[in-house]
Amino acid sequence: MPQYKLSEIAKLLNLTLQGDDIEVVGVNTLQDASPNEISFLANAKYIHQLVLSQAGAIILSKEYASRVPRALISTEPYRDFGRVLSLFSIPQGCFDGISHQAYIHPTAQVSKTATIYPFVFIGSHTVIEENTTLFPGVYIGEHCHIGKNCTIYPNTVLMANTSIGNDCIIHAGVVLGSDGFGFALTEEKQKIPQVGNVIIKDKVEIGANTTVDRGTLGTTTINENTKIDNLVQIGHGVTVGKNTVIVSQVGISGSTSIGDNCILAGQAGISGHLTIGNNVTIGPQSGIGKNIPDNQILGGSPAVDRQTFLKTSVLMPRFPELFKRIKKLEKILEKKKEHNI
């Protein structure tokens, strides 16, 4: 297990050390940390735990530093906690090299520095670049390209002509390039061949059991530094912009474009052939059925602006009561009409 002096961590992360130097052997929560572990405070609602915490040091902002005897002062405590965690985390896996139990087509090009576990399948004319790791059960179809420093976890599938950039993480069970949902609306529901492809740009992370489909023609694209949670469905021909976050169980229908720096919260549903602008936040379980311009915050189904959504959410539990009152008023008005009042 790695060990660091607190002063070493401060230097590596360019943080300010407050208090004396100690040896640190791990990372833990404020509640569970021991005197030789480091913790963090990123949310003020946990500030009461500072007094009770046994952590040897705490990563926190300058305004709270006086409350603890030993601290690493940070402008972004949660980010720097992640960086410290990386120092102590042990990489998954126990295999180096290229297994003779993997199938690699003779026309495939696999870097000597790649790690290919047993029972990986690599199809014809596929390229695997330097320092990329493929865990057991990964299937890579023909004419695929995987860039440098990627990690692809077990039982992931890349269908033919799928491309992944550099520094990507693809979690277990992901399927990239499966057929989009394309059928002619005839009595036979004839299948339309899906011969497009999927391109994943640099520094993308895709969570477990997410699917990104290819279309009839053209490309489904996930752009740089976008982060996708588990169990997300991205339809054929979709484009997702840079630095966008997509949370679990979101569904995006075919040929929709999502802009840069967007947040799609859990279980949001986006109809097909739409354009969602840049810097858009879509709340959980929202239903989007029209184009959305830049810089919007939306909620509800059908989705409306955030303020309207919050107001209607407050009113909704009162609807039965209000309905009764309206019916009562209607009866009073009817009686007045009958008596010409």
UniProtKB/Swiss-Prot annotation:
Which EC numbers characterise this protein's activity in its record? 2.3.1.191
Give the UniProt keywords, A-Z. Answer: Acyltransferase, Lipid A biosynthesis, Lipid biosynthesis, Lipid metabolism, Repeat, Transferase
Instruction: Indicate the secretion signal residues.
Output: none
Write out the GO cellular component annotations. Answer: membrane
Kindly list the biological process annotations in GO that this record carries. lipid A biosynthetic process
| Molecular function in Gene Ontology | N-acyltransferase activity
Enzymatic reactions: a UDP-3-O-[(3R)-3-hydroxyacyl]-alpha-D-glucosamine + a (3R)-hydroxyacyl-[ACP] = a UDP-2-N,3-O-bis[(3R)-3-hydroxyacyl]-alpha-D-glucosamine + holo-[ACP] + H(+)
- Residue runs in coiled coils: none
Q: Which domain of life is it from?
A: Bacteria
The pathway to which it is assigned is: Bacterial outer membrane biogenesis; LPS lipid A biosynthesis
* Active site per database record: 236 (proton acceptor)
The kind of enzyme this is, by top-level EC class, is transferase
Q: Fetch the SUPFAM superfamilies from UniProt.
A: Trimeric LpxA-like enzymes (SSF51161)
Q: Subunit arrangement?
A: Homotrimer.
| Purpose | Catalyzes the N-acylation of UDP-3-O-acylglucosamine using 3-hydroxyacyl-ACP as the acyl donor. Is involved in the biosynthesis of lipid A, a phosphorylated glycolipid that anchors the lipopolysaccharide to the outer membrane of the cell.
Family, per entry: Belongs to the transferase hexapeptide repeat family. LpxD subfamily.
Instruction: Report the protein name in the record.
Output: UDP-3-O-acylglucosamine N-acyltransferase
Its encoding gene is what? lpxD
